[in-house]
Design a protein with these regions (language model features):
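C-terminal outer-membrane/trafficking sorting elements
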Residues: 2-13, 17-91
Length: 91
């Protein structure tokens, strides 16, 4: 597979979701990444990823069955990149 040209956080799918969703991201180079979930008030409710990832495309599965229905924000951050995607949990 070709190496991505830039950092990217894709739209989570499915969205809206019930209990489980998939978060995909790509990196053009090896980097330390964090992906965290925040509620509508900005409070961190889950840390999904914290580690070193090689360049390429990656997937993270999130099971939110213990959280309430509502709007959440997926935030991906590295030394070179920050992006946030909105997601709706519907039970």
């Amino acid at each position: 597979d070709p190496i991505p040209l830039d950092y990217r956080l894709f739209e989570p799918y499915p969205n809206p979701f019930n209990a489980q969703t998939t978060i995909e991201f790509s990196l053009p180079l090896k980097d330390v990444m964090t992906i965290k979930v925040h509620d509508i008030s900005g409070k961190e409710v889950r840390s999904l990823v914290h580690g070193i990832f090689d360049s390429g495309e990656h997937k993270v599965h999130w099971n939110a069955s213990n959280l309430s229905s509502g709007i959440y924000f997926i935030r991906m951050e590295s030394r070179h990149f920050v992006d946030t995607k909105k997601i709706s949990l519907i039970k």
